[in-house]
Amino acid sequence: MKLLVTGAFTITAEQFDMLSSLGCEIMFQKDERGKPECDFSEADAVICNRLFLYHDISVFKNLKLIQLTSAGLDRVPIEEIKRRNIALFNARGVYSVPMAEFALSGVLSLYKHLNTFYESQKSHIWQKDRNLHELCGETIAIVGCGSVGTECAKRFSAFGTRVIAVDITKPKNEVYSDFYNIKDIKKALDIADVVVLTVPLTDETRNMFNKDMFSCFKENSVLVNISRGAVVNENDLINALESGKLSGAVLDVFKCEPLNADSKLWDIKNVIITPHNSFVSSKNNARLFSLVYDNIKNSMKGLV
């Protein structure tokens, strides 16, 4: 099997040897946007992230397997992959723990006014704040209860919160206190102190959180978006924040990345902005390689 590995996955010498021992002949494409550094038409399998945004899949004549380094499927030509019967794997579960920790830390930062204390520290000022909040007893709505959402639920639940699930189908995990079908999402938003978005980007979820949806949020609630930026209408979010409908937001993803320097979001009080970084962890490589190795091994055995 000829395996194309892009710069989206940093392969170690040990991992290279393990894949080679399976019978893989490994080719490299460091820059997914750049000109082909090898013959794409020879690749039987690909490990990538955004490769097919910059290179037409028709060039990959022999392609039988795609292993994405991302959890989302919005960067690949799904219909063509189905038509050609190409095995497609995402990185489900690989980034769930760091993303969940990130979501929780962001909310805690807002509730405990950590940014205020940080600014005081930089100026060498001893300034107390008597208006802090606690998570215990709050209601957390997780919109999208897959692997990331469920890991978020586990961590928020550990802080004594009531965690409710919002999804198409009811999750089997007992960490959720209640379930709302996505059709009834507005009922969930009305009672949630914190709303965490972990939904995939689809035609149905694009701009899902708009003016109409924000009007249903509980007063002074907090929005956390660690899914995809295009799920949220940013202008409507800005209005909801400036009007005081939302008391804060933790935003790791945006419709256009990098976020434009003149975006109002940068300067709104109680908004935490991070550069699509919530998934990062020193443990990701090992988790991802475990998936890669098993999927390629099974494919070569004809089990995929």
Regions found by a protein language model. Name each.
Residues 7-9, 92, 133-157:
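Glycine-rich adenosine-cofactor-binding loop
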Residues 39-41, 57-60, 135, 188-192, ...:
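A short, aliphatic-rich alpha-helical micro-motif
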